[in-house]
Amino acid sequence: MSDAPPTRLAQLRSQLQKAAYAYYVLDAPFMEDAVYDQLYRELVALETAHPQLITPDSPTQRIGDQPATQFTSVKHNIPLYSLENAFDFGELTQWEQRWQRALAGEIPSDSGYVCELKIDGSAIALTYENGILVRGATRGDGVTGEEITQNLRTIRTIPLRLNLDNPPPLVEVRGEAFLPLETFEKINQEREKAGENLFANPRNAAAGTLRQLDSRIVAARKLDFFAYTLHLPESHNSPQLNSQWEALEFLKKMGFRVNPNRELCPNLTAVKNYFEKWDEGRKKLPYLTDGVVVKLNDFSLQAELGFTQKFPRWAIALKYAAEEAPTTVKDIIVNVGRTGAVTPMAVMEPVQLAGTTVQRATLHNEDRIKELDLRIGDTVVIRKAGEIIPEVLRVLVDLRPEATIPYEFPSHCPECNSALVRPPGEAVARCVNSSCPAILRGSLVHWAGRDALDIQGLGEKNVILLIEHGLVQSIADIYDLTSEQLQSLPRMGQKSAANLIQAIAHSKNQDYARVLYGLGIRFVGKVNAEILAQNFPTLEQLQKASFAQLQGVYGIGEEIAQSVVDWFRVDANQQLIEKLQQAGLTFAQTQTAQTQTAQTQANHQISGKTFVITGTLPTLKRTEAAEKIKAAGGKVTSSVSKNTDYLVAGDNAGSKLDKARQLGIQELNENQLLELLV
């Protein structure tokens, strides 16, 4: 039995959001690109088939995650877009057909493509003023990154001064910082001798190195850099570059290292030959590459095609197939998450896979184990495609040892021994004991997280200590902790205890939306929590809201509405709210915020007007546009009717646009909407 669409969508979103957080915020990625790509494509397919289940916090509705705060945040002068992925030549052909259809005029016969190896490292943006390097930053979310100029100055292949006699006043260079394989091996050997944790792969090592606060460590690790694009001012003495190939040659002239294995290909047949050559040849390269970047060479065509919300239309990444490897299953264990979800894992003999040592693989759920007929002792094939960690692809039954027995999924929670429950229509078994240590542990870590109450010092290690020493039995208990109690914990001194007490006290001042998110209501992400807080300004209003009222809020679907209703029906949750209120937590928008919102809405020209949003807008997500409309006093609905005042239409607007025109409803593009909202 496969997962029901709502359940699978929730799983996919959760997995992708965790991976994006680790990649963009922590710079500590644990998911290979091939894994993320496959998950993302499955999510897109499910949301296309079930558009009513799309939520505002879905990874498909956003560009990226926010940068970390340990370094100074900087806004990129020109956004760093992601690349669309193709996983076979059929998808590459479809991409070519799309951009050809998008060009209204005649396609030049000599347009051609530039093929470059996709380096598995960290994207970097460099800014030069009058030829001098003044800023270097990570990609971040594509709009905002982290300034790491001092660290980038240590990379010998990044020139501090451009090799030009009369440089332009401003030059933006983009490229990839990476760690050569030989250097990576030496670093890990040194870390092993020092008793330090080993880097999982060169990509992780490069990301971690760039975020070192001590640039001397960065210099010692000898990162490398390939430049792959640049942006020049249109005025002054800037050279007129007409193609990607010319840009790469000019980058070389300025003193940058560009990948020598690039190639100018006249057509997709040549692109295919290039890809196949390097699919085999990459194994001999001194660095890791996970695919080929294919770009239209002609800059005029690039300018005409432009960008989608996330990708340039004139470029695509053709990815290598995910790697597979055989290994032996030593054990099957189950983990319990903060929502009580029980996930089986295969513990395996260590095996190298795409530069990573793999010892565990997800088995998803009980049904997947039965489908595979997986048994302890089996030889299996695992791959890096489809989950946060590797998955078991198939069992090599012919290699099965004698006397193996089918695996019996546990009927009771391994953490608290409560009976597991598998809700009808769901593939995941759950522990429903709110006092389960695993659920409590996950709930506390979530509550203290950066996007929730942001309690500095209350990470997983300290949470485990608090639970093991019997100091907390619920989230609310942290507000009763004393400095003396904390100092009784291992490695918790007086200063650390005082800092944690202060951080816990400060969390009482966090806004209502953060508190809602911190409660960990199933399916309620950060964006959903903000929507709920805006539409139900007090917890009392939210608790009294019916399923229909919740579902009627733009951005809150059936699944979220039912989850909120169910959560408030649980006695233990009501007791938790009561304790948190007694502790002084905020369960309402401030009166000032409510008053300002009401005044703004009442005075605006769109107050009381009804909007429908459809298609892909150039810069705003639909949820962002909806929130701007509601903030000005307008209403947003999901369907077009005679009561609709405005239809906001982006690309691929579809049937809603047709119906609006039939009814004579006024159409707005994004710019017109923003003008109306002023």
UniProtKB/Swiss-Prot annotation:
Domain of life: Bacteria
Pfam families: BRCT, DNA_ligase_aden, DNA_ligase_OB, DNA_ligase_ZBD, HHH_2, HHH_5, Nlig-Ia
BP GO terms, sorted: DNA repair; DNA replication
Catalytic-site annotation from UniProt: 118
Gene Ontology molecular function: any one: metal ion binding
Record carries keyword Transmembrane helix: no
Enzyme class, UniProt record, top EC level: ligase
Cofactor: Mg(2+); Mn(2+)
Binding site for NAD(+): 33-37, 82-83, 116, 139, 176, 295, 319
Annotated Gene Ontology cellular component terms: cytosol
Catalytic activity line of the entry: NAD(+) + (deoxyribonucleotide)n-3'-hydroxyl + 5'-phospho-(deoxyribonucleotide)m = (deoxyribonucleotide)n+m + AMP + beta-nicotinamide D-nucleotide
Annotated Zn(2+) binding sites: 413, 416, 431, 436
Residue intervals of the BRCT domain: 601-678
Keywords annotated in UniProt: DNA damage, DNA repair, DNA replication, Ligase, Magnesium, Manganese, Metal-binding, NAD, Zinc
Enzyme Commission designation: 6.5.1.2
Family: Belongs to the NAD-dependent DNA ligase family. LigA subfamily.
PANTHER family linked to this entry: CHROMOSOME TRANSMISSION FIDELITY FACTOR 18, DNA LIGASE
Biological function: DNA ligase that catalyzes the formation of phosphodiester linkages between 5'-phosphoryl and 3'-hydroxyl groups in double-stranded DNA using NAD as a coenzyme and as the energy source for the reaction. It is essential for DNA replication and repair of damaged DNA.
Protein name: DNA ligase
Organism, as annotated: Picosynechococcus sp. (strain ATCC 27264 / PCC 7002 / PR-6)
Gene name tied to this protein: ligA
